[in-house]
Amino acid sequence: MTRYIFVTGGVVSSLGKGIASASLAAILEARGLKVTILKLDPYINVDPGTMSPFQHGEVFVTEDGAETDLDLGHYERFIRTKMTQGNNFTTGRVYEHVLRKERRGDYLGGTVQVIPHITDEIKRRVYEGGDGFDVALVEIGGTVGDIESLPFLEATRQIRSEKGANQAIFMHLTLVPYIKTAGETKTKPTQHSVKELRSIGIQPDILICRSEVELEESERRKIALFTNVEERAVVPLQDADTIYRIPLMLHEHGLDDIICDKLRIEADEVDLAEWVRVLDAKLNPLKSVNIAMVGKYMELLDAYKSLNEALIHAGIQGRVKVNIDYIDSEDIEHHGTERLAGKDAILVPGGFGERGVEGKIATARYARENGVPYLGICLGMQVAVIEYARHVAGWADANSTEFTHDTQHPVVGLITEWVNAEGKIELRDAASDLGGTMRLGGQVCHLKPGTRAHEAYGLDEITERHRHRFEVNNQFVEALESAGLVISGKSADHSLVEMIELPEHPWYVACQFHPEFTSTPRDGHPLFSGFVNAALAYKAARARAQQS
C-alpha cells in the first residue's frame, strides 16, 4: 500500500521544494523504504523540451527519453530510484490526454470539465506513478495561490479524502523572512500561506520553514498555534552551505520520524553514513582545480544544473574542490581566448542555435593547441569535430548544417534515421516538429579498447542518455580518422559517432551524450572523474614546469 506525501510551496517561488522533497526521500530510503518522487508542473507546455533555458533552466532527460523538469535531476541524485516518463507531467500533457479521449468519444457526449475529468486524470497519473512503492512524494510546482495550480491541488485534496490521513499527508514549504533592520523573523507570511491552502480545503500536516537564521522555539510555537499544525511538525530549515547537508539537517529535526508516525510506517533505523561521507568529502577537499565552462546560457546557471553537480560529484570522489569559471562563448567570440589562460581544464557543454558557436569552436581549438584537458558534451563534441576539420583536416569551410547549408564540408548534420533503445528505427527530417522529436534517452554505446574513453569507463559497452538531433556526418568520418581523430565510441549499430578523442593530447575527450544526467554525489561518474584527474595532472605538470 503506497503512502503519499504531497509537497506544496508558499510565500515565494524557488524555495527549494525539489531539494526538500529529494532530501526527505533520501532519508526514507535510508530507512529501508522504497521511495519515488513525482513532479506536477502547472504550465501549459506538454513538456519543457522546447522551452528556453533562460526561462526554465535545464531540461533533464530520463533513461526512457522523457524531457522533464530539472527537479527530476535532483531526485535521481538523492535517491536510487530512476525517474521515468510517469514521474513528471504538466497541465498541458493532462489536457492533451483528456482532449484526445473526448475526440474519441470516451466521455459518451458528456460535458468535459476541470472537475471531474481533469482532476480524475491527475489522480490516475499520481496513483500510477506511486504504484509499487512504499512512499510516493508528489511535488506540486508553483506557489499556493497561483491559478494554474488549482486543478492539481484539488486533485490531491481528493486523494487525501479518498485515502485518509494515514495514507496521504500534506507537507508545506514556506519562507520565514528575517528582517535585518528589525533583527527579527516574521511568521505572518507563513500564516497567510497556510490560510490560502486551507481556503481550498487543504490543512497541511507538516510545515518546513525556510529561514536565513535559526528559528526560536517561541516562533515555532506561534506558527503552530496560528496554522493548526502540531508544534513538532513545524520543522525549521535554515540556509545551508551545500544541498548535500539537507538530508542530515531534516533528520536532525526528526522529520522522518514525524512522517513515519503520521503515515503509520514501520521502518528500519536510519543509516545516513553515505551522506556523512559525501558531506565530509565536499567540505574537506585536499586539492583544487580551476575549470572553465564555456557556454551560451551563462545568465541562468540552472541551464547547466546537472553539469555543475557532476563536476562537484567528481570532486567529492577525489576530495578535490572544483572551482568553475563560467564564460559566455560570445565573449570568447568577440574578445578572444585570454580568459582561458591559466585554467586547469576546459569544458564545453551542449546548446542549440548558431549564437556563440564560433566562440565554442575557438575554445576547442585553444584546448587542442595548448594541451589543456578538454571535455566536450553534445554540441561540445560537434564543435570539437568542426574545429578539427577546419584546422587539422584543412577544410576551412567545415560546419554543421544546424548553422549553415553553405558549406562543402557539412561534418555535422541532421540525424534522419537511427535505432532507438527498443531496437526500432526512428525517422526524422527538417520538417519534423521540434517538440519530442530528438534522439532521446538511454542509448547503448560501444567503446574502442585502448582509448581514454575505454580507460575511464573500464567497459566495452555503456548506456548514456542523449538529447540531440544533429550528429557527426558519416561521409567525413574516414577522412577525419585519417587526419588523426579517434572515434572512441559508436552507437549500438555502429552507425553513429558517440565519442571522439585525440590520442596525442594529454586528455581531449568529447561525447555526443549527456553523462551529467547519470552522475550522483554518492557514486560520481567515471568520465567526470577522469576529466578532473586530468585537470589535476595538468595543474601539477604546469607547476613543475614553472619551478624548473
UniProtKB/Swiss-Prot annotation:
Positions that bind UTP: S13, K186, T187, K188, P189, T190, Q191, K222
GO MF annotation list: ATP binding; CTP synthase activity; glutaminase activity; identical protein binding; metal ion binding
Residues reported to bind Mg(2+): D71, E139
Residue sites binding ATP per the record: S14, L15, G16, K17, G18, I19, D71
Binding site for L-glutamine: G351, L379, G380, M381, Q382, E402, R469
GO biological process: 'de novo' CTP biosynthetic process; pyrimidine nucleobase biosynthetic process
EC number in record: 6.3.4.2
Binding-site residues, CTP: S13, D146, I147, E148, K186, T187, K188, P189, T190, Q191, K222
Activity regulation as described: Allosterically activated by GTP, when glutamine is the substrate; GTP has no effect on the reaction when ammonia is the substrate. The allosteric effector GTP functions by stabilizing the protein conformation that binds the tetrahedral intermediate(s) formed during glutamine hydrolysis. Inhibited by the product CTP, via allosteric rather than competitive inhibition.
Taxonomic superkingdom: Bacteria
Amidoligase domain: region residues: 1-265
InterPro entries for the chain: Class_I_gatase-like, CTP_synthase, CTP_synthase_N, GATASE, GATase1_CTP_Synthase, P-loop_NTPase
Record GO cellular component, one term: cytosol
Gene3D superfamilies to which the protein is assigned, alphabetical: 3.40.50.880, P-loop containing nucleotide triphosphate hydrolases (3.40.50.300)
Physiological role: Catalyzes the ATP-dependent amination of UTP to CTP with either L-glutamine or ammonia as the source of nitrogen. Regulates intracellular CTP levels through interactions with the four ribonucleotide triphosphates.
Family the UniProt entry places it in: Belongs to the CTP synthase family.
Alphabetical list of NCBIfam families matching this protein: PRK05380.1, PyrG
Summary of subunit composition and partner proteins: Homotetramer.
Protein name: CTP synthase
Organism: Chromohalobacter salexigens (strain ATCC BAA-138 / DSM 3043 / CIP 106854 / NCIMB 13768 / 1H11)
